[in-house]
Amino acid sequence: MKMYTRIANQNSYSYIKRKRKDVKYIVIHFTANKGDTAKNNADYFATGNTRQVGAHFFVDKKGDIARSIRLNRTAWAVGGERYGDYKESGGAKYFRKCTNENSVSIELCDCND
């Protein structure tokens, strides 16, 4: 297991500092990219990301962890709109409760075997 720190470019997070005590939720997503790694994702978000998306941490199958955004910053990870199928999928239970501002985002890498 290795730990990396590779801070994402400004597109991925808010530069305004937040207090860690304001964090109430942990959001876990998966990248859906077969074979990707924590380090590769952190490298991409540090140099190649042009969209307003990001995550605080990436974790891969080997157990490697890459920190991409400091915990006192807000990652653009949760989104702002409900998906159209939220009633069927059971999603949106935390819509407007869990936000970018009050959550830490973790992306799981290569977990779609």
Indicate residue ranges for each PLM-predicted region.
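Active-site-adjacent loop/helix surface patches within enzyme catalytic domains
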Residues: K2-D113
